[in-house]
Amino acid sequence: MYRFEFSNIDNTSQYEELIKEFLQPSQYGNEGETILSYDFRGDKNDLKRQIYRDLSKLTGMSPKWGILTGIRPVKLAAELQDRGEDPKKVLMEQYLTDETKADLVCDILEYQRAKAGKPAPDSLSIYIGIPFCPTRCLYCSFTSNQVDQDAMEPYLQALGKEIDFAGEAVKADGYKVETLYFGGGTPTSLTAEQLDRLLSRVSTAFALGGVKEYTVEAGRPDTITYEKLQVLQDHGVDRISINPQSMKQKTLDLIGRRHTVEDVYEAFEMANKAGIEVINADLIAGLPEETAEDFANSLEEIIRLGAGNITLHTLAVKRASRLKEMDENFNYRDEELREQMLTAAHERLRGRGYVPYNLYRQKHTSGNTENTGFCNDDRPGLYNIRIMEEAQSNLALGAGGISKIYFPEENRLERVANVSNYEIYIDRIDEMIDRKIKGFFGNR
């Protein structure tokens, strides 16, 4: 067991995140017999490199992301490139990143700059949250609630009030909406009539003529109907997400999805019939009891169904999830298997004409891996790119929404958060609006 001692350091959180890439929580603590002492003398990355090399020597492990513990490697590479530095060289030499990861980051950066470009100074992305799901998945810790029609109507009324306010404020501040994203939760938990009402309100509040991408997450295929898809199409939605996570029925049952593989096939068929231009599909590597063959088969089915965007996630076991309660150390099991799953998936997708367009990392992710978005036909998820590069203001409406106003002169963001509990959001909607008046609008 190890014990870490730090001197001249007030906040050790980023170093602890690096330590967790090597050691399980049960392998270090105040009672550890092997003591590793560190004294901060200037550059935090020097200290992180020392920790990385010490733990590599002691454990025999060399995590491929090196000392990077942040969730936005592509943003870092962009900043390096803008300063005239070689991102790949810096990632490998200073951040100790494996060459395969450095190449992936640089490929994505090159694609983003060629296809998405930099956002206009007056552009804005908008997120609208619907915090309801049919069920809560085994691995999930998002603030979402099981569908309750009695709760939905009061929530939609409060959300509508925030939308109406935001529409006027966006116009007054001179913003132009570039992307619009409905997330959750599962927005298609709403009825077709509720969706129509909500999207009509959005169309009235905001000028959407210049919107480049309009996404609605329809993640749970059991919530999708042709009537709902027609509503989305009628309102200009051009991208949806249908997220099976796995195409193995045993896995779906185990993780609490409560839909069938057949539901996924039917959802794709309906979406194509309705004329939705881009369908994203999420798959998760590392789900309980899945093999590399299971994951490969799921990916092949999604490719065959014609998904224009495919996002490969690595299972992230959050503290508040039921899976964490069942197995505290699940993240540390089968790390090589998850890496094998993702490596094979990347090769297969590239071989089938898909290119990686977006990447982010999460805390609590299994095996020190990452989440990567792939696209074909040059239709990347633009909203996802903008959120990760953090060079544009993002207005987030609804319970749990965290707005971010961007100050380009200083290259920094300020956050303005809504409360996460939807019942408190309803009760305090006027306060949520007031927060945006004081913290978001009028600050450009």
Residue map of PLM features:
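Radical SAM enzyme core and accessory elements
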Residues: 1-75, 79-90, 159, 373, ...
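Key residue(s) within conserved catalytic/signature motifs
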Residues: 11, 100, 107-108, 139, ...
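N-terminal [4Fe-4S]-dependent radical SAM core
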Residues: 55-65, 82-126, 173
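Canonical Radical SAM [4Fe-4S] cluster-binding loop centered on the CxxxCxxC motif
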Residues: 121-156
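Beta-strand scaffold of nucleotide-dependent catalytic cores
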Residues: 129, 241, 309-314, 385, ...
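Conserved non-cysteine loop/helix-boundary elements of the Radical SAM core domain that shape
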Residues: 144-344
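Histidine- and/or cysteine-centered catalytic micro-motif in compact active-site loops
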Residues: 315, 362, 400
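A C-terminal junction/extension of Radical SAM enzymes
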Residues: 320-397
